């Protein structure tokens, strides 16, 4: 009997492809990684033939090999015979409807696979029917990735019916599809009575308010789900509020991701309020990281600090005292305040910076003085302070300090000590 390597070489000969050394070496290990190799339908046919009797490989990664429906059928035939492969990745292979049909039949018969990745294969609603049928007959598969496909309302109905009857699936990824309206509602209806699913990925769909209402009802009844991702689902304030109603009675969910939706701080506060009401909640992570919050939200969050392990990710705080902008003070008035507090006259203020007695102060020196003094805390920018001073504010009896669009401020001493009151309030 030929070994897997010899079988592969023979299969390459009859299919007209060049044997790949990476395949030959990988056939003796438990993991065979052939992603991005451009195998195509013929290349994967030769591989499938060599794997029919292989007992070593348990993980087969064929992502991004342009297998098309034909190649998908070859892999489906292989997996109907080989019961040693536990994990297969067929993502981004243009399998389309022909591949989905073959894989659906395979899932009905295979009792070894535990994880299947089928992301990005242009599957549509009719393909959901074939895949769901296979899943309803499967008693082993624990993890399925169908993200980045094109399932819509009918697809949601098929998968909802599957979830209501499937008793083994634990992780289901339907993110980046088009599940909305009746499809979203049907999927949630199936989730209500499901007793095995723990992780559900639904990010980047279109659940909106209708889907949020259905999900809230599912959260009230489901007792196994621990991870729910609903990011980017057009959920507004009302949707967040009804999900909060579901959280009031849910006792199993640990992670809820709701960022990149449409609700604001009111929706976020409703979620926190529900956690406050539900003393039996197991939630450990709440993601509302794109929601701008306020002090009221933070005060409500403080009341949940006794919840061990709870982490709430939120956006920036708008009206926190630490983030509020200081009230605007006209730059020249800010300098007046500084002079009055330190009992200085304007001339003395500038004279302290005129180290060489030239009566010309480098702008860089003026800038440093502003930044190092209390004036910095009063004025919005050093530049504004500089050019406010540049208005040639005349001191008493002809003294002046003027700034130009150059590198210096010119200072002229008045004939007699200036009256700061008259200068500051001309």
Could you say what each language-model-derived stretch is?
Residues 1-426:
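Leucine-rich tandem repeat or coiled-coil scaffolds
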């Amino acid at each position: 009997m030929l070994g897997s390597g010899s079988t592969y070489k023979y299969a390459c000969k009859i299919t007209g492809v060049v044997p790949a050394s990476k395949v030959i070496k990988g056939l003796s290990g438990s993991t065979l990684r052939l992603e991005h190799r451009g195998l195509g339908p013929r290349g994967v046919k030769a591989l499938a033939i060599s794997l029919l009797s292989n007992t070593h490989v348990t993980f087969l990664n064929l992502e991004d090999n342009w297998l098309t429906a034909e190649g998908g059928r070859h892999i489906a035939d292989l997996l109907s015979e080989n019961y040693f492969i536990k994990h297969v990745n067929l993502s981004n292979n243009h399998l389309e409807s022909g591949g989905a049909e073959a894989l659906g039949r395979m899932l009905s018969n295979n009792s070894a696979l535990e994880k299947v990745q089928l992301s990005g294969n242009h599957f549509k609603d009719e393909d959901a029917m074939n895949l769901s049928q296979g899943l309803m007959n499967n008693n082993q598969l624990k993890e399925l990735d169908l993200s980045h496909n094109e399932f819509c309302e009918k697809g949601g109905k098929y998968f909802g019916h599957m979830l209501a009857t499937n008793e083994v699936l634990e992780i289901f990824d339907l993110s980046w599809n088009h599940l909305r309206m009746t499809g979203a509602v049907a999927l949630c209806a199936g989730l209500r009575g499901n007793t095995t699913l723990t992780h559900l990925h639904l990010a980047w769909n279109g659940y909106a308010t209708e889907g949020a209402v259905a999900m809230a009802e599912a959260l009230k009844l489901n007792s196994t789900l621990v991870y729910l991702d609903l990011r980017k689902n057009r959920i507004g304030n009302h949707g967040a509020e009804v999900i909060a109603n579901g959280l009031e009675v849910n006792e199993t969910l640990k992670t809820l991701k709701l960022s990149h939706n449409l609700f604001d701080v009111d929706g976020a506060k409703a979620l926190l309020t529900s956690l406050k009401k539900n003393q039996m909640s197991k939630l450990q992570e709440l993601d509302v990281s794109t929601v701008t919050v306020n002090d009221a939200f933070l005060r409500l969050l403080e009341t949940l600090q006794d919840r061990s392990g709870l982490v709430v990710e939120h956006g920036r705080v708008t009206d926190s005292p630490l983030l509020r902008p200081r009230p605007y003070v006209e730059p020249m008035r800010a300098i007046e305040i500084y002079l009055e507090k330190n009992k200085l006259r304007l001339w003395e203020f500038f004279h302290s910076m005129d180290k060489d007695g030239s009566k010309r102060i480098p702008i860089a020196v003026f800038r440093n003085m502003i930044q190092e003094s209390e004036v910095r805390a009063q004025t919005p920018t050093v530049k504004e302070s500089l050019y406010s001073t540049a208005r040639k504010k005349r001191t008493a009896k002809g003294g002046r300090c003027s700034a130009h669009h150059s590198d210096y401020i010119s200072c002229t001493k008045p004939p007699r000590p200036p009256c700061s009151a008259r200068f500051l309030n001309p």
